[in-house]
């Protein structure tokens, strides 16, 4: 899933996908890519492929706000993402998306309101991730110059906030991931202490039970 796995001519992509599917025991492929790296021909091929094996296309959308996408130099708009997701779903291909919570310039209210746009997309699955600013990157330099633009979450604080996201999220969208933690030596900001994913899930489940809330309980569809 790393990198943009539709960023080649279709003939070369076909050879790569078929090579992966020829490995014994492989029953499908998950293709991570950018929304500006697909077209009708590539999706038509993947639609045919999905008739004989499991195919998932997962788009790195990251934000629904064009100002944010420009600020982090994504090189595409949210409308581009919407078109890619819709073209994929129209072909009955399983489609997922990835979003980052806490991107520079986005308030918590912005993040909560973005769930409405996410709900409007024909997504099967979604992955969320709290912002982590890696050392030695342009974003680290921007953070040093403009720290007020950034929202970092402490672990317990993020669990509470993600409950709010989940309450507003369309109930049929499967959440495949809601957080992650790189080793502290690689990023700046709060460290969650290399907490295990299953521990995060347990914390979220407990908080949902304590608050007596669930995915979609505030969804207005």
Language model features: what each stretch is:
Residues 17-29, 33-35, 115-154:
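N-terminal/domain-start segments enriched in small and hydrophobic, helix-friendly residues
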Residues 17-24, 44-54, 86-90:
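Acidic (Asp/Glu)-rich catalytic clusters
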